[in-house]
Amino acid sequence: VVGDKIYLFCQGGKNFQTNSLRVPSAVLRISGSNIQSGKPVDIDSDYYVDLNDKTGDRYLWRCYYLGDNKFCLQLFTNPGMDGYTEGTHKTFGIFDVETQNYTPVTGMPEAGDINDIALAYASDTDKGTVTFELMTTSGAVLYTINRNGVATPGTKVEAEVIKGASLLKQK
């Protein structure tokens, strides 16, 4: 939910019942008269974004809200259905739901240098960042991605493995 609008991020993929139907990752919106008594009743007919068109045909794995209408997208590493077949999701980008602009994230290690990305993450909408733990070929490192699409390496963790990062805030 961004303001009075609800955005739906759909992973898309392949219809596994058939070999022919391919559904793109997409963003849909619910707003205005399509929200009645605080409940969504319909999807806006004037808002549809084919994320595969924006991301070089990469499918969506997960998304994280960064504030200021921007989401960090975690995408399958390889484009097209090869991404599903191969299965890793080591590509990131920033998507602005208002402008519908997509910006690839810079500053991340090459996909071949990333062994794993932890599922747990730390999101800070006040600062517009999301932090992930990456197990790279040189060890565990926390990477922070900002809403401008820049990833910055942070703390290197001296451990065999780390399963994620969290953010605690005092209210």
Short names for language-model regions:
Residues 37-52, 101-110, 152-159:
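Beta-propeller fold detector
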Residues 22-35, 87-99, 144-147:
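Beta-propeller blade signature
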Residues 1-71, 75-77:
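Acidic, serine/threonine- and glycine-rich low-complexity intrinsically disordered segments
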Residues 134-171:
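Hydrophobic, glycine-enriched assembly/anchoring segments
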Residues 2-6, 31-34, 65-70, 118-130, ...:
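Short, solvent-exposed coil/turn segments at beta-strand boundaries
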Residues 51-113:
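C-terminal structural cap/anchor segments
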